[in-house]
Amino acid sequence: MERIFRILEETDTKATFFVIGWIAKTYPDIVRQIASKYQVGSHTMNHQLVWQQSREAFKEDVSSSIKLLEDITGQKVEAFRAPGFSIRESEGWAFEILHELGIRMDSSVFPAHHAHGGMPSYVSAVPSWVEYNGIRMKEFPIVYRKILGKHIVFSGGGYFRLVPYRLLRKWTRECPEYLLAYIHPRDLDAEQPMIEDLNYI
């Protein structure tokens, strides 16, 4: 975590840490350390995809994660990201539940097709609002480039490994108003275990 903090501080980068509940329960001191410097948001309790759950199960999962994080940090949790960006067009009800639970900022919209979900019809490339059944919630979507009519996501996770660096740099520089990138702690862990003989695959 110290390496992540150092990089954020040296680059003067704002960050929200979306924390999984069971990890917070296992490492509460790390969560308190994060909360002393940055916003802590919910990443659910058990990292289950939204569309795999009923409304009731999703509400219970997120509610328990919020309560746990608030108990650990002493701060109100108002930010959320769905595991795998798994709020699809058909799961708009999730925003209604999040709003009911006190979430005011979401970062779950993946404005392209995605293995775990995605909202290809979402057209805003900058922070905007999502609406469902009369509720409005601030949305910070994943950044994309429009190429040949398709939304191409590039600013996070495995995309940092798949997209050539020159292209990453070019597209990043072409986002002067808003750039949201996401990483997992393991992405910066030089000691992350590697699969044997992976280089030969």
Model-derived features with residue positions:
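N-terminal regions that are enriched for targeting/export leaders
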Residues: 1-6
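A generic secondary-structure signal
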Residues: 7, 68-71, 170-171
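C-terminal domain-boundary segment and adjacent tail
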Residues: 9-12, 162-201
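Metal-dependent polysaccharide deacetylase catalytic core of the NodB/CE4 family, i.e.
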Residues: 11-91, 103-104, 108-116, 135-136, ...
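Short, hinge-like loop/turn segments at secondary-structure boundaries
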Residues: 33-36, 58-61, 96-99, 124-125, ...
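Surface-exposed, active-site-proximal loop segments in enzymatic domains
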Residues: 46-57, 152-156, 194-200
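Active-site-adjacent pocket scaffolds in enzyme catalytic domains
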Residues: 75-76, 82-182
